[in-house]
């Protein structure tokens, strides 16, 4: 292996060219991801299902494609959301939705609770579109998963996107890398060696 690398180590210019080529591949992938994020209006336009809470609709390891340009989330729609203070996307179905032009369907009790809530950055307003979610394979709704003191999700603040398509099982690679950090180092090492060995 070192014998194969010897020509590159003895030729700094060629080695630098290979490193730049590797950096170009990474930057192209990054720009593609950012472009997709802008188009879908989602910070994470592609996510992986991490649990079995949405079976049988989605299995662990399925790769989901998201769209976040709709102002509302309808009952029955599958959304991905982030819990405040956590960085783990959750894929669940909307079972209740109200607010932001729902025709005044809120209960008086809910309106009173909203009137008592403070307003400010990161907090839902009484006019925001709010939803309640639940995993298809779960018995209870997601209230216990939300941030402390949060009864519902805010469509604008908490939702990453709505599911518009998926590819089964492809995301298992991501799960394996997340559960085994050493595999990331090995994978990057292999990619680096492959680029170094690539001849123009």
From Swiss-Prot:
Lineage top rank: taxon: Eukaryota
Gene: SEC11
Chain positions carrying an annotated carbohydrate: 105
Keyword flag Secreted: no
Enzyme class per UniProt: hydrolase
GO biological process, one term: protein targeting to ER
Biased composition (Low complexity): 118-128
Keywords of the record: Endoplasmic reticulum, Glycoprotein, Hydrolase, Membrane, Protease, Signal-anchor, Transmembrane, Transmembrane helix
Region (C-terminal short (CTS) helix): 186-197
PROSITE patterns, per database record: SPASE_I_1
Protein name: Signal peptidase complex catalytic subunit SEC11
Residues on Lumenal side: 34-200
Catalytic activity line of the entry: Cleavage of hydrophobic, N-terminal signal or leader sequences from secreted and periplasmic proteins
Organism: Arthroderma otae (strain ATCC MYA-4605 / CBS 113480)
Segments on the Cytoplasmic side according to the record's topology features: 1-14
Function (record text): Catalytic component of the signal peptidase complex (SPC) which catalyzes the cleavage of N-terminal signal sequences from nascent proteins as they are translocated into the lumen of the endoplasmic reticulum. Specifically cleaves N-terminal signal peptides that contain a hydrophobic alpha-helix (h-region) shorter than 18-20 amino acids.
Regions that span the bilayer: 15-33
Membrane topology summary: Single-pass type II membrane protein
Chain spans, region Disordered: 101-129
E.C. designation(s): 3.4.21.89
């Amino acid at each position: 292996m070192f014998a194969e690398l010897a020509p590159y180590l003895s030729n700094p210019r060629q080695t630098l060219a290979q490193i730049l080529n590797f950096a170009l591949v990474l930057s192209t992938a990054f720009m593609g991801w950012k472009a997709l994020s802008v188009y879908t209006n989602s910070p994470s336009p592609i996510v992986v299902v991490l649990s079995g809470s949405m079976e049988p609709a989605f299995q662990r390891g399925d790769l989901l494609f998201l769209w976040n340009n709709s102002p509302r989330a309808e009952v029955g729609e599958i959304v991905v959301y982030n819990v405040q203070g956590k960085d783990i996307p959750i894929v669940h179905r909307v079972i209740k939705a109200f607010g932001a032009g729902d025709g005044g369907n809120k209960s008086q009790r809910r309106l009173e609770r909203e009137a008592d809530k403070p307003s400010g950055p990161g907090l839902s307003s009484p006019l925001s579109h709010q939803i309640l979610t639940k995993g298809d394979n779960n018995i209870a709704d997601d209230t216990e998963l939300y941030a402390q003191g949060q009864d519902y999700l805010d469509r604008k603040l908490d939702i990453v996107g709505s599911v518009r398509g998926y590819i089964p099982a492809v995301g298992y690679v991501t799960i394996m890398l997340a559960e085994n950090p050493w595999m990331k180092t090995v994978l990057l090492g292999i990619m680096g060696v492959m680029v170094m060995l690539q001849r123009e």
